[in-house]
Amino acid sequence: MIDVQQLRALVELSRLGTVSAAAESLGFSQSTVSHQLAALSRATGAVLLTRAGRGVRLTAEGRALAARGQEVLDLLDRTEREAVSMARAEAGRVRLAAFPSAVASLVPGVLDVVGQQYPGLEVELVDAEPPEALDALRRGRVDAALSFSYIDDDAGEGLESVHLLDDVLYLVTHPGGITRIADGAQCRWVTGCARCHEELIAVGRANGFTPETAYASDDYVAVQALVAAGVGAALLPGMALSAYRHEGVQVRPLAREQRRVEVVARAERPRPLAIDVLVEACRTAGRRTSLRRPAVRTGGSAASR
């Protein structure tokens, strides 16, 4: 069997050109490196070196073994780093940014998966809507972020996203309110975060009206309370309605309107195993999440477009 240290001596000789340089790089004497090379030649049964003046040079067999040896050493180095990373993942901390409805519906599943597989890994939760969450991710303040978008775009330079699920949008009204999104000009609207507001504007324009905003709140519980009080209508995603449903509102699904929910991490390689563990836990939680379709109080959908 080939000894790793002997293989490393051959690789260093190939890289540096002389036994003395290889010995200095490895921290051994020239005599020790020469013995290692001779032992490697005996172990393989191949002539690896030939005399060249006062020094030596690699034979064709020596060059071939050195090239393959570099691959083996690289693999060993990666394996060692992964083992260290795994040990840290089993007893460390990762930071996850998440928007409110994800905290209520998706994050509990993420924490459950991590807790079962890596009980020593602590997940620190940071509340943040997508723009702020992605900015925190780029700045290294969090390790991953749960995000959403209403168009199929990438997360941005230096980031990579993994699709988790598609979240249907619902028209939320008080009893006696509008029943079709096309009638949106007849009422005022309660809107949410910046991205949610942009989507409301886009949906409204696609259905022939520009929404008149009455109030804005990132809190989906508050939004439903305002709708129930007759302040206006709202668009809310299924994740929010599955986490909390006010008894005083009616909901109708919007055909063809949904948002893409994803987990985003920095596109770095190699990446700490703890972050990979967190991303995979998000994928597992996404697969397990069964978004309860909110009951439609009056029947039918609020067809859009």
Q: What name fits each language-model region?
A:
Residues 11-30:
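Short helix-boundary/capping micro-motifs
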Residues 41-60:
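A short LG(V/I)-centered, amphipathic sequence patch enriched
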Residues 91-153:
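Central regulatory/effector-binding core of bacterial HTH transcription factors
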Residues 129-134, 138-142, 148, 195-250:
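Hydrophobic hinge/microswitch elements
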Residues 154-163, 167, 221-270:
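Beta-alpha-beta core module
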Residues 156-193, 272-273:
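Flexible hinge/capping segments at coil-to-helix
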Residues 178-179, 250-300:
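A late-sequence structural motif
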Residues 186-208, 229, 271-279, 286-295:
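Secondary-structure junction motif
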